[in-house]
Amino acid sequence: MNILIIGNGGREHALGWKAAQSPLADKIYVAPGNAGTALEPTLENVDIAATDIAGLLAFAQSHDIGLTIVGPEAPLVIGVVDAFRAAGLAIFGPTQAAAQLEGSKAFTKDFLARHNIPSAEYQNFTDVEAALAYVRQKGAPIVIKADGLAAGKGVIVAMTQEEAETAVNDMLAGNAFGDAGHRIVVEEFLDGEEASFIVMVDGENVLPMATSQDHKRVGDGDTGPNTGGMGAYSPAPVVTDDVHQRVMDQVIWPTVRGMAAEGNIYTGFLYAGLMISADGQPKVIEFNCRFGDPETQPIMLRMRSDLVELCLAGTQGKLNEKTSDWDERPSLGVVLAAGGYPADYRQGDVIHGLPQQEVKDGKVFHAGTKLNGNHEVVTNGGRVLCVTALGETVAQAQQYAYQLAEGIQWEGVFCRKDIGYRAIARGK
């Protein structure tokens, strides 16, 4: 069957690369894709924006697309799944109503409260003075979140009162995140270790993916501003078997059943961003309605199952008939970013030293890249590449990933040097 992957990031390169390994796949299109997907012999880019729903739908109908997999959040939140389903096309992702779990942080916090799903204490605000009064009452550290989509950057962890007040003013009065910040969530600062817990949902059944841990801050040792993610590894040792069971029982199942009970039946990837306390209690920091980026890259490197088969089962309500199979070895991905990211950065720099052939137990996934007129790969985003590797331990996977990354150069390239440090400190 022909398959369409929507999106242009590292996540979509990884999903397309994995989908192409399926015996069910004939032709795989990526809309709009990037230089990495353009250079994959098994993938073909289509010049349609991820948010051009009419264009995507017309393409799917004219190219006999049997399955569409949605990568990013933006098309989900504007209803790509609703449009494809209305046309009778199989698409794996949540409806516009169900995608509110990511599209509105206030909706999510209220939903969690209604269903007694563990999360941080919070309040929603549209009024600056009321928000400032709450911040002064609670004190720092405290977390300020823009309500809407802000490309993973709309969260300020304020360690001082002054930072908190600045964040409130920037969002509510200063328009720092446009419409996304016209309502904010102010919530308690949670201590613990973060994990990304991603599952597939078909409306009723749940199939967990491998666990992972992202590294949100731009600098080594988790310093500097938040980003879309500077690297990830899988599995996350903080998610022990006991914690895994708690997450399923206290977070995932109540969410899937709660959404169904409220008339928003959830299908697609569901990503719970969790904080896990020292005693193993998970609390929800956020939900995403899609696979994480960069978590997808190390997770796909470990996946042995047929991704297409699983996504099809997800569209047919048959995930209860499926299991997922994983390489026992851990994997780790390091993001190579453009100088200046997550603030202003240059684009259009030629990337040198990319591997010319497939490497054993490793893969360079492209994110913010494109081909220029000379067919050279150039930078086209803040997060440019995710260099991913398998190893017998997280430490070995880390060593191999950095070794692969070493030869790749462009003007201003940088990366964190400590991806995976928490797992390595645990002796994994």
Curated annotation (Swiss-Prot):
Domain ATP-grasp: 109-316
Reactions mediated catalytically: 5-phospho-beta-D-ribosylamine + glycine + ATP = N(1)-(5-phospho-beta-D-ribosyl)glycinamide + ADP + phosphate + H(+)
The keyword Magnesium is assigned to this record: yes
Pfam families, sorted: GARS_A, GARS_C, GARS_N
Domain of life: Bacteria
Entry EC no(s): 6.3.4.13
Keywords: ATP-binding, Ligase, Magnesium, Manganese, Metal-binding, Nucleotide-binding, Purine biosynthesis
Protein name per Swiss-Prot or TrEMBL: Phosphoribosylamine--glycine ligase
Gene: purD
